[in-house]
């Protein structure tokens, strides 16, 4: 089987640790996969930046220019944007990291250059003359910026704007599928959807009248709309119908012979040739196409038709007696014997009739015209006005203004370029896409197409076709929101212009940018599409950015979305993943883009195809949207090709109009580029996806996004080859921006000296800061580790550091573990998992979670709160972890209830108890006037303090702890500065030395004579910084020296300025919320080991809960004594139909066996060559690697030297990494070949032994290496207990849920259970003292304190609430208590 190489760059240069993954796959991809987060970045780039070179205008500029110029109501002033460079985005005040730490928005201030022009208007001639123009830069608020990874920092949290899928603007034709009318006939409808503005609906009703609705209001006959457009009755009829002239002749009427009309018909009368009088077609006989063609060929031109046949036809024109003005017949009137007599008398021999035959052309528009009550344009406009503004009396002017504003005014109605393109395509129009309002021709064309559908011509549209749905990405969503804000601002500006003297003000005085800023803030802060980024692991980040949602403003709602919208559609192929979508109410509404998909400029999703020319597949790749693909026949990526690109088979499996067909090879026009273009990123990470049931694959792709990053990441032995792409594009692993040499490496940063020519003004140093133990949005741990050593050569794009869940630049969500499929004492019943103690002991699945806690000291009415170590009534033991400032130390081990930050709050004076008085007498004031409001660690959290950040309000004196943190940060910045300077000096002075050597000194520093030839000794005698004082005789060289000096000075200055700027920001104080004096954030790292109750999963939708952790010695073990790690239930496979996991297990078993073989060969070589330098080369190891990896990797393995081969062999001794790409992966034969090569049984099964008895199990068991993930559903986060806690305000019942520290609900069914057992007292205490009997609760507490265990139940608070609710309904219900007497009189009295 031919295999393709992973990457041509894996040549083992020093420094780049990179695996070679053995990929099973025949298909070589001709096009590179687009960057996975390109959708986000490109969209926002188009919103922010115009490109004068190509003439592209950014979305932001388009929006600004659509609102400006703003004119006042009188027309005496106009506020406009400067024509060129109208706006500028300045550099942001804080960088991304500062925004994350300070909790602020990463944004750039926008300045717009506005011109205020004032005019004088001549009252008589109404001409304007310009008086004055004032220009000024106006601040228009901050525009949030996107980070390199496609996210936004809003108030310090990382957010993603999800793209929205909505109905494309344009025209859609549809019918009701016979559901509206009882007869079941189809009622056709057309809808013109604009980008913004009024919707226009045309529809047939049950009487076959064509109606129109504007904005889903009351319906009107369509002819009212056509009249309003200025068309008369005759114009309307002529537009929809042809005209036939009937001429009076002897014995009837003479009509032109139209071949198509008569072919295949059965006339009810004899058809006579008007010229010869012969009967050509007798009555009652079907006219065959052959006979009709013969008649036409014989020269038949006109037919003679009996007079009765004219009755029931419709006149095409008004016929008027010109002398008297009497109308004989109106256009559209039916011809009857009466009006035919009138025409006879008038001597009219020729009649123009509408060509309506009731078969291929129906009288729908004519009938509508007759049903229309409005005779002319004015009446039609008035009718439309009454529908749109019911209750207001129309005048001609208001009606005309309203109608023009509805569809023909660019400010109120916008089809957008997309809408115009769709309209043109559907209706066959030819109108430039700059015309974004409706035209009369458009409306006529829509009605004509609708009538054609009714007449049985053409097809209705499919709403769910991706040609009729488009994607709105970040840029467009923000553009729409910003326009809303600007329009609000425009109103305010107009009012301000009319209320002040415009000649005395500047643009700044008129503009209040608050509405625009508020619109942007609202969009990023609270829009349904602006979401808190899912940052569990790198895959979840990438998937979140590639998500496409049909929900959100202007989209669908969960409740209204039917089955069709959610379903997979043939046009999804290669555009939207058919697998990855949530389970539950959002299924099918939230989707993921496929791997190769991209969004075009119109917002349609495109997918790439290879062109097929003359039956040969070329390397040309074109991207097509669903509309463009319709006319093509597309072959599968797996179709077999010859060397020259021709198809091997005569019939090729292909797609045509959404159907799968076997097409002849010469009809194929396109071919897929890759088998994985069908699925999304997450689904493409599942090996053997083709062997899994789709429902399970859906769960698998969703659960990979919940995998928690572990302390040690393991790339899968069995992957798909996509792992590296995801790690790189997600930004989790750091790739080098420029090539160079590694200068310094430590845990927190990598310094690379750039090689090659450095552009002037650019630093020659790249410093990469690594994120160390930072908290993600989901509290998982973000930690990056360097992969390079000092002196390594780095190429641009190389992975230099691993991030969370990555290993050597590959995505690594879980661990490879040894699993056995067998039952074990019921501990794997119903998907439970039995695991070995080794997994816990060796921290295989241990993860670190970082929790953030914050406390604020505010200014209260009673005085300021204080963060301090001096807390009343707290012993020294509780304060052991706090420093002098009252803040916990970094590195302290903390447990639930421990104080993290000491805080005291002033409290009002209240009457003192004797105890308080005593305390006050002993300790003075402090004890009474403050209360302890310290930040304590909540239950269920225990760990180590990893970071503390203190924020102080500007102008407040800072404490020692804050100063220490600041100094530490400044030292770090200074270290960066010194490193950059040192590398800059080294590089510059080496270059300077090369330029000076051999030159003659025209000027020199002190102590060196002029005219001396500069050599090594001369330079050694002078301090380095004095070298600049040399001048050389060679003018060209002297100019070069001066250029280097200028570049050096600029670089030194830039480094210093950067340092000063950051230092100043640190010392400036922080922007805190109003009323907050000080804020402290404490980060606690929690180590979560695997324990029973944690959820684990594979990549095939196979999930389970850990039921028991078994000692290693009790686990089933292999023949060599190795105990297995996991025991899974084999019954979890057959009914779930996810057989991919078995293939993975077998191939993983082979990978482990091959790794063992390599390890043995390596150990044998080491034994034979104790001194590697003097010994034999490791040829046996090299040959074994070549045998395992196959011919495609031979060149790559040969290119490595002996040392690299040993390193390589060492790195794969635990298991050889393999890749099985989706739909093109390893087949059964490949798996058995690998098992054979590893020296293992081809069945993949082995004899296992019981760890407790040492006996072999009865039959062989499937054992292998499987990739297992630990999911973000940890038992520690879910387990919860409460004795007492908060109560609901009204009902006084305990709250619910862990977050509220609530209780367990004792519901209706639980009450029934206790009633059934007759446990009356238990039930009573459940419903009273343990719930909402307030008095009883207190009494029970007091009794328990005194050691008494009796209690009395009182009245539950919810009863009182019920009584109050009944009273609010006007029912005076009172609860009367009686003394314990048995006489009925008492009851009677009470009742009275």
Swiss-Prot record:
Q: Which GO terms describe its cellular component?
A: DNA-directed RNA polymerase complex
Alphabetically ordered keywords of this record: DNA-directed RNA polymerase, Nucleotidyltransferase, Transcription, Transferase
Annotated GO biological process: DNA-templated transcription
Report which superkingdom the organism of origin falls in. Answer: Bacteria
Q: Return the InterPro entries for the record.
A: DNA-dir_RNA_pol_bsu_ext_1_sf, DNA-dir_RNA_pol_bsu_external_1, DNA-dir_RNA_pol_su2, DNA-dir_RNAP_su2_dom, DNA-dir_RNAP_su2_hyb_sf, RNA_pol_bsu_bac, RNA_pol_bsu_CS, RNA_pol_bsu_protrusion
Any one GO molecular function term: ribonucleoside binding
Q: Its biological function?
A: DNA-dependent RNA polymerase catalyzes the transcription of DNA into RNA using the four ribonucleoside triphosphates as substrates.
Subunit record text: The RNAP catalytic core consists of 2 alpha, 1 beta, 1 beta' and 1 omega subunit. When a sigma factor is associated with the core the holoenzyme is formed, which can initiate transcription.
Which family does the similarity line name?
Belongs to the RNA polymerase beta chain family.
Q: What is this protein called?
A: DNA-directed RNA polymerase subunit beta
Gene label:
rpoB
